[in-house]
C-alpha cells in the first residue's frame, strides 16, 4: 500500500507547490511598515518600560514594544503581567472588590510578519536541564496561552513595533463577566460604546507600564430582584455595570534573589512547578515559599543587619483617621519579627500613602480600605514572580464594616448606654477601643499573608496570656472576662504585638545565610529554626485541617481560644450568660428604634458558636502534626477518651433549653421590625412573621451544634476509633448522651418546654439526616437506625399533656416516613443561622 501511494503523493505535492508559487507570483509586494516616529508624532507620548501613545482624535491607545529578546527582532524581553480592579462592585457576594489584584504571569511578545502576539508561556512545567532538546520536550508537551494578537502599525529602526492595543486594554482581563455569571447574576458583556481608556490611571515608568480602562458591562437578559439580587443591591442601573480594570506590565526583577524551599512545617504559602528532569526517586513537584527580597548590605553581618532595600508598605489615606492609625500601628508590628530574624529596626516599614501616589501603581505594597454593601472577608494577596516566588507587590484589602460589626459585638457584651449618662469620648469608649485593638490585629494578619504566611489555626491552643500574642495569623475570638459583679470586660479582647509563632515563621522565611559574600540556602539552619520552635510546644496547622465541619484536629480551629476547647467553651458560655442577664435597652443608644435590639442580640445569642465547634472536634478527634520523616515530631494520636467525653458534656450544654430560652423580660422589649429596617440574613430566623421568634432562634442555635456533632465524617471516625480501642466513646455513646442530656422524652410546659421540644425535633432531624447520608458508613447508618427504632417505641407512649402528644405524633410521623423508604427519604435542612464569620467582618 505504501508503494502505491507514492505517485499520488508526488502529484499532490507538485500541484500544491505549483499553486503556492503561482499565488506568490500574483500577489502584491508587501508595503514596508510606517515609521514609528512618523506614525506617533501627533499623539501624546508616555515614555516608559513599554511606551504608550494616546491618539485623542480617535480615542485609541497605542503600545510600543521593543523587540530586543532575540537578534532577529522577533521577540520581546520577558515581562511580568498582572491585572487589578481599581473600581470595584462593593458586593461581598460577587467578590469584586476595589483594589483586588491577580497573580503575576510571565509574558512576552512575538512577531510573525504583520502580527504581534502576547504570549504567556507555561511556567507550571519546566526543566532544570541545560540541554536544548530537553527544554524543547517540555515546551512541546504542554500548551502556552496567546493572550492577545495585534497588527503591527509601524516600526522603528531599532526593532520596536507600534500596535493598536485599545481593544486589549478595554477587554475583561479581570473576568468580571465570569464572576457575575458565577454568582448567579446573569450574563453581562462589555459594551464598547460605553467603555474607554481611563487616562487618569494610565501611566508609564521606567520599570512598569500601567493602563486603566473604564468598562461598562451590559446585561444580556432580565435583571430582576430574583435573578440578580447582588447586582441590584449596589448598582444604580442593574442593566449597566461600570467598573475599572487595570493592567500592569513590569520589568522582571534582577538576578540575586535566592528561592527558599517550602516546608509544610514553616507556615508559608507554596509556589510550585514540575521539573521533569529530576532524578528518579525525587519529587517532580518543586515547591518554594513566596517571600519578598531582602539582601544584607554587609554579607558578613549576623545581627541587626541593614537591608539594601527595606520592605516598604503604604496605608490607604481614605481610611478614617483612627482606623488609619490602627492600620499603620498593627502592620508595623512585623518589624519586631524581622528583627528576630537578624535584621535592623526599620527593615519593615509602614507609612501613609503619599497624597500624590497612585495606589494601583504596582510598585507600591498597599493596605487598602474597602467599602462593601454587606459584611465580608478582608484578605491579603500578592503578585509574585512565578519563576522564583519573589513577591513584587503585596496587597491588603480591609473591609470597612469590620469595625462596625466589632462595635456591635462590644455593645451587646457591655450594655454601655446608661440612661441619662453622656456618651464617652473616644479614649473612654470601651467598644471603640476594642475595635481599634481588632483593627491593629487584623492589619497585622492580612499583611502577614502578603509576606507569604498562611494561617496558623493551632496558635490559639498555646497557653493564653493576655500580654502575649501567639500568632496574628490565627483567627482570634475576643477574650472577654467577667468581673466579680458580673460585668463583662472587653478591655483585653485582643493582645498587642507580633506573635511568638510569627517570629519563627519570619525567621525561617527571611533570615539570610551567606557564603563567600553571597546569599545561600542553609537547610540544616532552617531545620533547626523549626525544631527549636517545636520543642516549645508551638503547633502549626492551617486551613485544610481547620475549616471542614468534619475536621478531626483537636487544636486547629477558627475564632477560638484556650488549650482545652471544652473548658474554654464552659467559660464562654458563662460570659454569654452574664451578658444576657444585663442585656436590655441599655445596649442601644437613646433614640434608636427598639427593634434594633434584635440586631444587637444576634452576636451575643450565638456568642458560643465557634468555641462549640472547637470542642466538637475533640469528639472523634485525632491529634497530629505535619510530620516530615526524621523531624522528631509526634505521630498521630486519637484524642484521649476522657477528653472526648469532657468535650461532649460541654458541647451538650449548648443544646440546653435553659441556655437557649430567652427570658420574658427581654422578649417583652422586642417589637416587630420598624418600617425601613427589615430583617436581613444577619437576623435570627423567624417562623412568626414580623414578630421575634424565640423558638426559631433556639432551633437555629441548636442546629449549629447538631450539624457538627452528627457530621458523617465524625460519626464514621467514632465507629473506627471505638473499634480500635473500646475505651474510646462509640457513636452510640454520643447519640445516647445527646438524647439523655436534652431530656428527649420529658414533657415540659411553658416557653422552656417549647424550646426543649424544638431542640428535640432538631436532634431527630440530625439523626435522620445521618441515617440517610450516603457518605456515612454502613455501621454508622445501622447504629442510627437502631436508635430510631428504639425512639419510635418510646414515642408511641402517651404524653401527659397535649403539647407533648402533638410533638410525639410529629416525631413518629417523621420516623415512619424514613422507614417506609430510606432511599427516598429527604432530610429536613438545618435551620439557617445568621452568618458568623468573620468575627467582626464580612461574608
Where are these regions (language model features)?
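Conserved catalytic/binding loops enriched for acidic/polar residues
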Residues: 459-460, 467-843
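Bacterial N-terminal signal peptides
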Residues: 8-19
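The catalytic-center signature of Zn2+-dependent metalloproteases
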Residues: 351-371, 437-491
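Auxiliary tRNA-acceptor-end handling modules of aminoacyl-tRNA synthetases
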Residues: 25-319, 337, 344, 352-405, ...
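Bacterial N-terminal signal peptides that target proteins for export
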Residues: 1-9
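Boundary at the C-terminal end of the N-terminal hydrophobic targeting segment
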Residues: 21-23
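Sec-exported extracytoplasmic/periplasmic mature domains
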Residues: 332-343, 448-449, 453, 478, ...
Amino acid at each position: 500500500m505504501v508503494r502505491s501511494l507514492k505517485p499520488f503523493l508526488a502529484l499532490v505535492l507538485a500541484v500544491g507547490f505549483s499553486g503556492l508559487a503561482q499565488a506568490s507570483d500574483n500577489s502584491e509586494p508587501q508595503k514596508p511598515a510606517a515609521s514609528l516616529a512618523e506614525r506617533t508624532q501627533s499623539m501624546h507620548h508616555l515614555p516608559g518600560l513599554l511606551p504608550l501613545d494616546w491618539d485623542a482624535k480617535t480615542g485609541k491607545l497605542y503600545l510600543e514594544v521593543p523587540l530586543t529578546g532575540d537578534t532577529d527582532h522577533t521577540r520581546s524581553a520577558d515581562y511580568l503581567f498582572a491585572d487589578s480592579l481599581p473600581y470595584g462592585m462593593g458586593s461581598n457576594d460577587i467578590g469584586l472588590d476595589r483594589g483586588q489584584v491577580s497573580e503575576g504571569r510571565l509574558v512576552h511578545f512575538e512577531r510573525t510578519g504583520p502580527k504581534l502576539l502576547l504570549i504567556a508561556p507555561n511556567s507550571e512545567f519546566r526543566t532544570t536541564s541545560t540541554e536544548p532538546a530537553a527544554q524543547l520536550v517540555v515546551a512541546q508537551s504542554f500548551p502556552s496561552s496567546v493572550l492577545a494578537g495585534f497588527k503591527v502599525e509601524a516600526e522603528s529602526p531599532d526593532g520596536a513595533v507600534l500596535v493598536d492595543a485599545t481593544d486589549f486594554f478595554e477587554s475583561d482581563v479581570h473576568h468580571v463577566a465570569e464572576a457575575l455569571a458565577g454568582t448567579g447574576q446573569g450574563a453581562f458583556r462589555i459594551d464598547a460604546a460605553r467603555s474607554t481608556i481611563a487616562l487618569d490611571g494610565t501611566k508609564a515608568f521606567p520599570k512598569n507600564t500601567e493602563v486603566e480602562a473604564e468598562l461598562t458591562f451590559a446585561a444580556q437578559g432580565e435583571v430582576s430582584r430574583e435573578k440578580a439580587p447582588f447586582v441590584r443591591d449596589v448598582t444604580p442601573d442593574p442593566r449597566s455595570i461600570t467598573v475599572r480594570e487595570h493592567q500592569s506590565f513590569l520589568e522582571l526583577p534582577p538576578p540575586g534573589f535566592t528561592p527558599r524551599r517550602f516546608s509544610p512545617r514553616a507556615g508559608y504559602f507554596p509556589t510550585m512547578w514540575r521539573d521533569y528532569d529530576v532524578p528518579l526517586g525525587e519529587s517532580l513537584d518543586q515547591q518554594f515559599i513566596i517571600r519578598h527580597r531582602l539582601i544584607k548590605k554587609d554579607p558578613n553581618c549576623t545581627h541587626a543587619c541593614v537591608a539594601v532595600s527595606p520592605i516598604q508598605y503604604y496605608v490607604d489615606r481614605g481610611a478614617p483617621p483612627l482606623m488609619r492609625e490602627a492600620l499603620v500601628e498593627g502592620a508595623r508590628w512585623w518589624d519586631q519579627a524581622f528583627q528576630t530574624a537578624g535584621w535592623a529596626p526599620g527593615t519593615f516599614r509602614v507609612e501613609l500613602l503619599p497624597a500624590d501616589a497612585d495606589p494601583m501603581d504596582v510598585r507600591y505594597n498597599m493596605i487598602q480600605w474597602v467599602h462593601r454593601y454587606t459584611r465580608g472577608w478582608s484578605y491579603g494577596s500578592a503578585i509574585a514572580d512565578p519563576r522564583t516566588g519573589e513577591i513584587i507587590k503585596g496587597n491588603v484589602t480591609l473591609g470597612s464594616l469590620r469595625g462596625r460589626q466589632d462595635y456591635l459585638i462590644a455593645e451587646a457584651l457591655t450594655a454601655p448606654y446608661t440612661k441619662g449618662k453622656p456618651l464617652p469620648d473616644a479614649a473612654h469608649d470601651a467598644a471603640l477601643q476594642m475595635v481599634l485593638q481588632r483593627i491593629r490585629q487584623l492589619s497585622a494578619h492580612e499583611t502577614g499573608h502578603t509576606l507569604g504566611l498562611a494561617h496558623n489555626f493551632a496558635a490559639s491552643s498555646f497557653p493564653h496570656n493576655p500580654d502575649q500574642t501567639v500568632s496574628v495569623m490565627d483567627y482570634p475570638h475576643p477574650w472577654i472576662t467577667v468581673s466579680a459583679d458580673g460585668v463583662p470586660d472587653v478591655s483585653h479582647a485582643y493582645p498587642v504585638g507580633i506573635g511568638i509563632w510569627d517570629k519563627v515563621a519570619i525567621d525561617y522565611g527571611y533570615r539570610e545565610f551567606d557564603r563567600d559574600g553571597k546569599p545561600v540556602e542553609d537547610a540544616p539552619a532552617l531545620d533547626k529554626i523549626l525544631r527549636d520552635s517545636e520543642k516549645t510546644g508551638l503547633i502549626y496547622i492551617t486551613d485544610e485541617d481547620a475549616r471542614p465541619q468534619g475536621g478531626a484536629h483537636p487544636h486547629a480551629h477558627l475564632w477560638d481560644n484556650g488549650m482545652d476547647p471544652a473548658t474554654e467553651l464552659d467559660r464562654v458560655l458563662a460570659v454569654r450568660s452574664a451578658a444576657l442577664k444585663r442585656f436590655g435597652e441599655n445596649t442601644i443608644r437613646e433614640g434608636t428604634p427598639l427593634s434594633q435590639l434584635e440586631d444587637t442580640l444576634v452576636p451575643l445569642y450565638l456568642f458560643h458558636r465557634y468555641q462549640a465547634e472547637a470542642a466538637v472536634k475533640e469528639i472523634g478527634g485525632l491529634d497530629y502534626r505535619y510530620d516530615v520523616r526524621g523531624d522528631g515530631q509526634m505521630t498521630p494520636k486519637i484524642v484521649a477518651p476522657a477528653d472526648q467525653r469532657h468535650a461532649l458534656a460541654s458541647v451538650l450544654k449548648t443544646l440546653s433549653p435553659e441556655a437557649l430560652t430567652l427570658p420574658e423580660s427581654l422578649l417583652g422589649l422586642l417589637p416587630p421590625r420598624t418600617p425601613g429596617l427589615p430583617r436581613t440574613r444577619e437576623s435570627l430566623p423567624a417562623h412568626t412573621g414580623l414578630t421575634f421568634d424565640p423558638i426559631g432562634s433556639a432551633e437555629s442555635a441548636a442546629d449549629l451544634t447538631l450539624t457538627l456533632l452528627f457530621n458523617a465524617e465524625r460519626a464514621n471516625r467514632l465507629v473506627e476509633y471505638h473499634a480500635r480501642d473500646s475505651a474510646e466513646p462509640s457513636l452510640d455513646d454520643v447519640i445516647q448522651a445527646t438524647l439523655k442530656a436534652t431530656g428527649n422524652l420529658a414533657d415540659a410546659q411553658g416557653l422552656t418546654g417549647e424550646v426543649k421540644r424544638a431542640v428535640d425535633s432538631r436532634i431527630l432531624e440530625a439523626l435522620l439526616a445521618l441515617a440517610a447520608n450516603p457518605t456515612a458508613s454502613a455501621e454508622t447508618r445501622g447504629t442510627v437506625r437502631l436508635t430510631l427504632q428504639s425512639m419510635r417505641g418510646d414515642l408511641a407512649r402517651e404524653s401527659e399533656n397535649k403539647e407533648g402528644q402533638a410533638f410525639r405524633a410529629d416525631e413518629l410521623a417523621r420516623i415512619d416516613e424514613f422507614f417506609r423508604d430510606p432511599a427516598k427519604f429527604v432530610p429536613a435542612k438545618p435551620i439557617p443561622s445568621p452568618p458568623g464569620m468573620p468575627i467582626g467582618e464580612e461574608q
